[in-house]
Amino acid sequence: MSKYEQFRREHSVFLYRSYEITESADKVDVSYKFSIPGLADFNPGWSFPKPENVSVSGDLTFERLVFSLGMAEAVSYWKAVCSPEMIVECGELDGEQISWWKKLWFAGLGEFFYVNGINADKESFVKIVPKGKFAGTSAAELRKSEGCLVPIGGGKDSALTIETLVNAGMNCRCYAINKRCSISATVEAAGLDESALITASRR
């Protein structure tokens, strides 16, 4: 029996237990709870800057975004044992969304499967079972979209992207995860002020 099969037999269920949203005057904190029963619990989190006089309390659109970020986070912990079943105890998923997430996960795990010699099937590698409900009730306020948001990692691709868009006259804001000197340098080199950079923190 391979380790893949052994781990799946020993840890048949992975749980996406919950997410929690808290906000202060200038930021929103998000925390998640994932669990491999009998083995480990995981509690990653994010912090996002927030404009003054803006609240996300009860905002269903924001809650959906937070839930989806959790679905993207979960795979990093699921792959520790590759449980054949993932029970999602929060948020909501319909059949089409489940298929979409399975496709995204499977494609994103290609190198992981290859390096570890895992012969996984895209249909049966995981069964996603939704059991939750959203708490939010109000739709987000409609806002007019202006300019573009450019993800910045500090490498050549993001530097070229932001330079091209700025030179084309686009109104650009930059988005980064866990600020580093190379990220600030990329924004500055594009001729943008530091205030054009939105930085989220992952913990």
Name every feature range the model reports, one short phrase each.
Residues T161:
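Contiguous, non-catalytic segments that form substrate-binding/exosite surfaces or channel walls
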Residues M1-G147, T164-E194, I198-S201:
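RNA-binding accessory domains that recognize and position tRNA/RNA substrates
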Residues D157:
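Hydrophobic/small residue at the entry helix of a nucleotide-binding pocket
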Residues G153:
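Active-site cores of enzymes that catalyze phosphoryl transfer or operate on phosphate-rich substrates
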